[in-house]
Amino acid sequence: MKRVLKSTGNIFLHCNTASSHHLRILLDEIFGENNFRSEIIWTYKRWSNTRKGLLPNHQTIFFYSKTNQYKFNTFYEDYSPTTNIDQILQDRERNVYGKTVYKRDAGGNTIPAKEKKGVPVSDVWEIPFLNPKAKERTGYPTQKPIELMDRIIKMASDEGDIVLDPFCGSGS
C-alpha cells in the first residue's frame, strides 16, 4: 500500500483489540514511527448480557501518512451547550487600570465575538455501531457505518482525490 500512496497520502487501518498491538508494530516498520499520526478510538454504545469481563465498546483505527506533507482537513464539533462560547470568543483588551474589558468600537459598542468554528475533533469518535436491523446493513459481518467512512475520507482527501478501498465497499 505504501508504494501506491502519493507523497501527501494517508492510510487508515481498522483493527480489533486482539491484534492491534501487532499491527501497530508492523505499521511503524512499513511507514516509520515518524509517520504515525494518530490512534483513533471509535467508540459506540452496545448492550450485552455478558456476565464476566468488560464489554467492548470501542475499536481502533490507526492513522499513518506516507510523508510529513500529508493531507489533513480539520473537522470541528459543536461546543458543549454549557459553554458560554460568546463570552470565551469575545475580543478583550486592558483598560487604563489594567483590568481586562471587552473591546469596543468607536461608538462604544462591544465588538461581536469571533467566528464560532467549534472544537477540533479529538482522536475519540463517538459514532453509532450498526445494529443488525439498520437500513444501511449489507449483510457483511464486519460492516462499518457510512458516517465513519465519510469522516475519514473527508478528513484525508479533497473533492476529486483518488481514494482506495481495498475491500471494494464490502464493509460499508
State what each model feature region is.
Residues M1-S172:
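Core catalytic lobe of class I
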